[in-house]
Amino acid sequence: MNKNILLRIAKVAFLLFLMIGTALIIRNNRNKVQQSQTEWTTNEGKVFGTPYHITYHSTQDMHDSILVALAQVDSSLSMFNPESQVAKINSNETDVMNPQLKHLLAQSLEISQKTDGAFDVTVAPLVNAWGFGFKNAESVSQAQIDSIMQFVGYDKISIIGDKLEKKDPRTMLDFSAIAKGYGVDQAAAVLERNGITDYMVEIGGEM
């Protein structure tokens, strides 16, 4: 057979090989993109009075399990849920803490000691006085602040067994500084327990 003909056949075969190979690569990548897009799940809602957005790489919808975890945090720490553990402690309906609240309060008191009170969960009366909490206020005087400070301070409370002991019944707790971040941790823990490692959890700006 003529060498020129053989050369042309070889070129055509090579071009066909390239075209088929390229088509297979494109199709494979397209399938991967489509598969990746269908494997992302998004859950949204509200907790602690603020929106949350959770996205994770899984076809398994974990929203129900996440809601259970967030509800537990809400029932322990929410200032805006009158049935929460912290709300009942603030209103002196009870002095008994559930394990979750006790654990977080113990950690909070440790941080308060290390920061010399820069972080303090007993600021609820001040927060309310300034209108940033669950009560509204138009203005606050220095005299009011001085009066409130008489029962604000981490040294005004202590943990005795499963109970919270207050030196003054007007002392109230506010976990707003850590509640959302703790909620993020609990939602993330649900995902990781189910083998999901690619995710983003955002609650009220905390991630």
Model feature map: region roles:
Residues 2-179, 189-200:
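A contiguous, well-ordered beta/alpha segment that forms the leading edge of an enzyme domain
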